[in-house]
Regions:
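Conserved phosphate-binding loops in nucleotide/dinucleotide-binding enzymes
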Residues: 415-430
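Hydrophobic alpha-helical bundle architecture
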Residues: 421, 443-449
Length: 449
């Protein structure tokens, strides 16, 4: 049967759990661990300093996982607030909305003379969109098992970057990289989260204190949600000019967000980090639109926040496709055109995209009557050379939104295993609906609540 990271068992293994800084950047001031140490099975209580990859924490090592988790609850930790102690996502959103209009931006894609088209068109649209921070929330919480002995290190961890695991394990254990053995079991969901090295550094640090003893560190679900590297919060300002017949004369998008790539590089490869680096992931899905928009510009306003961000399933496309397709709908409405037909017109030079759009609309019976309170929407995106169109049928009752059906058409080229493609698409639909309706991460007074 499949072995995941949490299934790993090594002879003589002990177990660890931890509590991490409650606010971004906080450090440990003091620890009262008397009650925790008195619990049966507890072997050690360890203060873990903050690193470039991980928050400050206090860990308990015990004979069993439950003993470690229970002892963590008995810890009395005093924390010294850090620079992120006052951070608030409501205030951040207000600041982003201002920056979307006035911030200094870097241009990623430009063609034609969009500003001329925006000067005095028959129809002008100017819209703001916003998405929150999102956690990865993989089904299997973070875990790693490490063994340090005789100048070597062995580690078992579900991961998306074994070379980085080797580097960071070697540095933490203070052994040569060629003395590190990395085992990569199945991982219970990655989505970009398991390219990070926080749990690796923490597990190896604990194992180094207990030479010859394998230590399995398991994060609780609460720690997993409060100490993710999140999909960035982002605000977009989208402007378009339409002529009197509803044709797009100009299209300008500006996104305000942190840099996923810059944040990740700063944690994992700090020597390569540079403020001059342009992060294409911040605007992917906007600078590479398939639509016929000869007068366009896509630009990014870079921000820096105490909230760590990283790669999240589909990265920039996860929010930029939403921005672009929502605005296409607004343009269609302003032009008094059907959203499907409006897109077909914009795809006159993109036959593959147009075929996918038409397939989704046909399979969904686009234009068929709907019951009162129900609606139907369509969207198209290309991400990593795969073209996807979806039609969603929804029902609104008061404040409740119910998704009744999603029809999806995909052109990914040659499908070597169609069942895997189907599984990925079905999972992506559920993932996207969860993100849109339920996934918001809120920060108050520097803490995820």
């Amino acid at each position: 049967s499949a072995i995941f990271g949490g299934d790993v068992r090594v002879p003589g293994q002990v177990y660890a759990a931890l509590v991490q800084a409650p606010t971004f950047g906080a450090t440990v001031a003091s620890v009262d661990d008397n009650v925790a140490r008195s619990r049966r099975g507890v072997k050690d209580v360890v203060v873990l300093s903050a690193t470039a990859t991980s928050a400050a924490a206090v860990a308990v090592v015990a004979e069993r996982t439950w003993q470690a988790l229970a002892a963590v609850a008995d810890l009395r930790v005093e924390w010294t607030p850090g620079p992120g102690a006052t951070h608030d996502t409501d205030a951040q959103r207000a600041r982003y909305e201002s920056l979307a209009r006035t911030g200094e931006a870097r241009v990623f894609d430009a063609a034609g003379t969009p500003d001329l088209g925006l000067a005095a068109p028959p129809i002008l649209l100017d819209s703001l969109y916003h998405v929150p921070y999102l956690a990865h929330a993989a089904m299997e919480p973070l875990n790693a098992t490490a063994l340090v002995r005789d100048g070597s290190c062995e580690i078992w961890v579900g991961n998306q970057a074994p070379t980085l695991v080797r580097w960071f394990a070697a540095k933490t254990a203070d052994v040569p990289a060629d003395r590190v053995t990395v085992h990569t079991p199945y991982l219970g969901g990655g989505f970009g989260r398991r390219v990070e090295m926080d749990v690796v550094v923490q597990a190896v640090t604990l194992a180094k204190r207990m030479p010859g003893v394998p230590v399995q560190l398991v994060w609780s679900r609460e720690e997993d949600m409060r100490h993710d590297v999140y999909r960035p919060m982002a605000t977009a300002r989208c402007r378009a000019a339409l002529d009197s017949r509803g044709n797009v004369m100009a299209w300008v998008t500006r996104v305000v967000s942190q840099s996923c790539t810059g944040s990740l590089v700063g944690r994992l490869l700090p020597a390569a980090a540079s403020d001059a680096m342009k992060d294409r992931t911040a605007l992917e899905g906007l600078f590479d639109l398939p639509y016929d928009l000869p007068h366009r510009r896509a630009e990014h306003v870079l921000t820096r926040e105490p909230v760590p961000v990283g790669y999240w399933r589909s990265v920039g496309y996860s929010h930029n496709a939403f921005f672009a397709e929502s605005f296409v709908d607004e343009c269609a409405h302003a032009a008094k055109r059907d959203p499907f037909e409006f897109r077909r017109t914009l795809l006159r030079h993109a036959p593959r995209h147009r075929a996918v759009l038409e397939a989704a609309a046909a399979r969904a019976d686009w234009g068929a009557p709907l019951a009162s309170g129900q609606g139907r929407g369509i969207a198209l995106a290309e991400s990593y050379r795969t073209i996807v169109a979806q039609v969603a049928e929804v029902e609104v009752r008061g404040a409740e939104v119910r998704v009744l059906r999603v029809v999806c058409a995909v052109d990914c080229g040659f499908a070597l295993d169609p069942d895997i493609v189907r599984a990925q698409i079905e999972g992506g639909i559920v993932f996207g609906l969860t993100a849109a309706l339920l996934g918001e991460i809120t920060v108050k007074k520097g803490a995820v609540i």
